[in-house]
Each structure stands twice: as C-alpha cells, then as structure tokens.
C-alpha cells in the first residue's frame, strides 16, 4: 500500500517538479491511502513504512526551514502505530531530520539515505537479518531545527551547560534537551561490542605529527557483525 504522498503541499510538489517530473502525486484522498495502508498493516506481522524526503528536497538550492517529516507521512505513521503492530521505519533522506516523535513511535529505524540501484536488495538483507547493520551516523540528528548547528566536538564558548552542575546562568535550552537526538557516530547492530585496552603511541601530538591509537574490539553478542570505531 502506498499510504501517503511524499507531501500534500502543492507548493512543494510544484517546486520539486519545476524542472523534471520528480514526484508523482496519487490523486486519492489522504484518508483513502491511509485506510488502505492500515488494512494491509492489520494483516501483517510487522509493518515496514518507507518515509523521508524526495531527492529534490535535499540537493543543491533545496534548503528547508522545517526538517520534520512532511505532515502526510506523519499522519500515516500515527495511523500505523495505532494498529499495535511492530513498526519499522525505513528512512530515505539527504539530510539529518528531526525525528523526536518518530523515535517514540517506531520499534526500529533504518537509515538508508538515498541508496543506489541495489539499495532495495541491501535494505531487504538488513530487515530480514541476512546482513548485520554496522554503519554509524556521519552527522548528528538534531531534536528540532532550533538546535542547528549541532555537531560533534564543537567549541563550547561562553558558559556551557554542565548537567552535573546546573546553573541558572549557563547556555542551555529550557524547552528541550541540549544534546542531539542521535549524535555523530550513533548506530545500532543485531549484536553488541565492547571496546577496551585503548592505547596511544604518544601522550602529545607534535606539530605536523601523528598519533596512533589502538583498541581491542570484542563481539559480545550472539550474532556475527562488524562495527566502526
């Protein structure tokens, strides 16, 4: 079942189709498409919903002020969640999105970005457990657009917030947590790993020099897998 159009916003659809027929709009009503998807979900053991952006929403000269999923897709996810079936969201997007609500609704999220011609096979391998996902996020996912810029290892200036020593006069959001929803380097697996015995070739880094780090990585789970350090 299709479930929803990428967006029901005619202005965005017109923009995406300005130079090419990039997005095809289903003429059925949003509720009709949702009803069809819910009927299929009720007959399923697990619901897999593919959501995200059209490719034209994330390329050059395609900035967005709202980085949540389009409302049409959010309505679909809410309806699928209401069925009570396990819900897996497959994300196709070209930028970090604000997914606070979806994080609460989904039992699992698989980030695929914009995959190539064999993307469908690769996604199926992960979903069916034939391949163990091992990727980590190359960028942080904010909780909302108001957190941008949020990135790993940024320079704390002024009076940065310390959660262990809260103070009224420190830099923080009072309506949201300070950290990102998914930080740089975040990623789950069907197994678990432990990292130990971290050693450095030198305690100092000379100008134009290098330092080599070594670690011991152990698969502590019951499935084969790989990870990124």
Report each predicted region and the residues it spans.
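Secreted, periplasmic, or luminal enzymes acting at the cell surface/secretory milieu
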Residues: 1-25, 92-226
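Hydrophobic helix-and-loop "lid/oligomerization" segment in the mid-to-C-terminal part
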Residues: 9-104
């Amino acid at each position: 079942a299709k479930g929803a159009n990428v967006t029901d916003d005619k202005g965005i659809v017109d923009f995406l189709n300005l130079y090419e027929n990039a997005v095809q709009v289903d003429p059925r009503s949003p509720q009709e498409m949702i009803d069809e998807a819910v009927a299929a979900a009720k007959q399923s053991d697990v619901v897999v919903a593919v959501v995200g952006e059209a490719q034209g929403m994330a390329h050059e000269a395609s900035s967005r002020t709202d980085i949540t999923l389009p409302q049409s897709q959010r309505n679909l996810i809410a309806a699928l969640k209401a069925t009570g079936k396990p819900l897996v969201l497959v994300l196709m997007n070209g930028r970090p999105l604000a997914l606070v609500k979806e994080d609460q609704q989904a039992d699992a999220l698989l980030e695929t970005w914009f995959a190539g011609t064999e993307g469908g096979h690769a996604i199926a391998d992960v979903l069916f457990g034939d391949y163990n996902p091992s990727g980590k996020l190359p960028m942080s996912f904010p909780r909302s657009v108001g957190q941008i810029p949020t990135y790993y290892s940024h320079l704390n200036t002024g009076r940065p917030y310390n959660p262990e020593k809260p103070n009224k006069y420190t830099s923080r959001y009072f309506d949201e947590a300070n950290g990102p929803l998914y930080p740089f380097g975040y990623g789950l697996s069907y197994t678990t790993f432990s990292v130990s015995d971290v050693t450095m070739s030198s305690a100092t880094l000379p100008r134009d020099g290098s330092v080599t780090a070594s670690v011991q990585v152990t698969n502590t789970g019951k499935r084969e897998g790989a990870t990124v350090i």
